[in-house]
Amino acid sequence: MTIDRHALGFGYGEKAVYASDPWTSRGRLYDEGSSPTRSDFQRDRDRIVHTTAFRRLKHKTQVFIAQDGDHYRTRLTHTIEVAQVARALARALKLDEDLAEGVALVHDFGHTPFGHTGEDALHEMLQPYGGFDHNAQSLRIVTKLERRYAEFDGLNLTWETLEGLVKHNGPLLTPDGKDTRGPVPQPILDYCEIHDLEIATYASLEAQVAAIADDIAYNTHDIDDGLRSGYLTFDMLEEIPFLSELMAEVRARYPHLEASRFTHEIMRRQITRMVEDVISVAQQALSEVKPGSVADIRAAGRVIAAFSPEMAETDKRIKQMLFKRIYRHPDIMRIRTGAAQIVTDLFRAYMDNPKEMQSHYWVDHIAGLAVAAKARHVGDYLAGMTDTYAISAHRRLFDQTPDLR
């Protein structure tokens, strides 16, 4: 792995020709005047941070249920960590840091309470009505469900931020219109009818670094939380050569380090090596593609910000370890079963009696809706809940609520 340090950005100087430019943005769905003090991408980031959806991430599960302890990561702390890695990558590659950060900050808005378990349960309930997808839900939140402004629903974010939100994991369609990862969620197709996000092309490089930053952050920090919880041990980490090498490096330099500091020294090295790997791969890809603009990035037909084959294999092995040792651990599976029951019970209760939602907006706007629209309305309400609110709502409606501890 080699990095051209002379080509790195350090937060000053001109951006690369292939970086997104807020001054030539494709604009917003609803035209607004420009700000004399902030770029359009800075305004997007600021709007995202001030949303209700962002604050709710504090009490939404990353891996461990939010009530498990104050030291475990939540969706909010994970999101902040992703944004930090995304900014670091964007700075090194001379991209627009504000756009990369904005995409990172908004990427998890659509997650339900109880993480992927809640999403799976809600998807099952909504299956007859088009299902549920957290990425599509993120788009619904920032284009419709956040109600803050007098002249429009949503946040009226720039085209570039919305593109990054929808396409940060790659195109949703092939150039000839075929699905790349299963059917495109209907909310995304509906929005593209009025504001075409060009879902058959790759996203900007800013969006790509936000996506790879997500991988770096959650792999590293799930290991940290796994060690803290006891579901992982240092011996388990030794089974992965990359992690074993990092541990040997730390032991050689600090022979008698206490466990908590030892863990941190491993994690910081893991993040650094992964970030440097992505920078090296991106620099090589850019030298091959030779993009003269962000349009060339979108038309490149390949991911620019990615892991090397060796690091991709390490990433795969880490995911397999986390899946086996944590995500499928009997304790976690028991909690997941209870969490799924809470989401399922609440959905059925609200469909049977919408007044139980106990919110004037949600109750008033459900009257007269057809069954499919009613189900989506209930799904929107449920998806916005935090873990703690969903548990308390279930306790209010049912005699027995699953113990998620």
UniProtKB/Swiss-Prot annotation:
HAMAP family xrefs: dGTPase_type2 (MF_01212)
Entry keyword set: Hydrolase
Domain of life: Bacteria
Paired cysteines (S-S): none
GO molecular function: triphosphoric monoester hydrolase activity
One Pfam match: HD_assoc
Organism the protein comes from: Rhizobium rhizogenes (strain K84 / ATCC BAA-868)
Protein family per UniProt: Belongs to the dGTPase family. Type 2 subfamily.
Protein name: Deoxyguanosinetriphosphate triphosphohydrolase-like protein
